[in-house]
Amino acid sequence: MPHIDNDVKLDFKDVLLRPKRSTLKSRSEVDLTRSFAFRNSKQMYTGIPIIAANMDTVGTFEMAKVLCKFSLFTAVHKHYSLEQWKEFASQNPDCLEHLAASSGTGSSDFEQLEQILNAIPQVKYVCLDVANGYSEHFVEFVKDVRKRFPEHTIMAGNVVTGEMVEELILSGADIIKVGIGPGSVCTTRKKTGVGYPQLSAVMECADAAHGLKGHIISDGGCSCPGDVAKAFGAGADFVMLGGMLAGHSESGGELIERNGRKYKLFYGMSSEMAMKKYAGGVAEYRASEGKTVEVPFKGDVEHTIRDIIGGIRSTCTYVGAAKQKELSRRTTFIRVTQQVKPIFSDES
């Protein structure tokens, strides 16, 4: 029977954070570092929990080199060869604790993952990524990976509801990726009509995960540092970024020059371009669920990282959180009809 859930569900654009009294004198006093103990792997994480998405135009080795300097994390895309992994690991051993090896559910993906983790034991994180994390096949795959790698920390997704977060955690995942359709180059909501507003998804999934001592990643939907802060305020343990990290020197994607301006290609991993590149084209039984865009070239990603980190520090001072850990406890969202005045920009 069709059913309508009449509860209001909200996105990042629908809210602002209410400022609160603070004893902080400076943004520099804010500690953005988090430490987590993972439920199933029993491993520890320490760092600033922002993750470059496992897209071949974002989650590159070049990106990982820069992000690890800031104690940020990279989910490296799955299309690097074993030899490329070995070369990177030998030249950048300090980065290995701040990255994950990614895999789909295919047998060739799993074989590649096994080879990487066996060859480079310092890599302790695995990112199991499918568009639809609700399939029984995916749940069984997570169980198999947990059985094969009992001491690796497993990220798995994507889902948007509490019951599936619980299912994946109980199946062996440590960190659940939350988000269906919010990404800037994702067209799943248009092609399928399926999705969930990201802010509400994060709040509900965080509640489910934390009850089991699990963790979540807010994956997608952030277009500015304020959105990243809102995701943390809503209870996300990690925030994964794609579009915000696209278009840089360290990003993948072809560099294009037109009329004296530089652009970089950025595309979803379910887009026609990605499927042509890695699968020989779009299979007859499926539709492309991503698009390709040209992002104005932004230069070195270091400047963007500083902007994001600076924004979150400022958020913490506005709400009186001396540590990022306190941000969700200090968060009160207010519903709004307008975020910014769009007089001098295209923002709305």
From Swiss-Prot:
E.C. designation(s): 1.7.1.7
Residues with PTM N6-acetyllysine: K291
Keyword presence, Metal-binding: yes
Catalytic activity: IMP + NH4(+) + NADP(+) = GMP + NADPH + 2 H(+)
A GO biological-process term: GMP metabolic process
Any one GO molecular-function label of the UniProt entry: GMP reductase activity
InterPro entries: Aldolase_TIM, GMP_reductase, GMPR, IMP_DH/GMP_Rdtase_CS, IMP_DH_GMPRt
Gene3D superfamilies, per the entry: Aldolase class I (3.20.20.70)
Subunit structure: Homotetramer.
UniProt-recorded name of the protein: GMP reductase 2
Species assigned in the record: Bos taurus
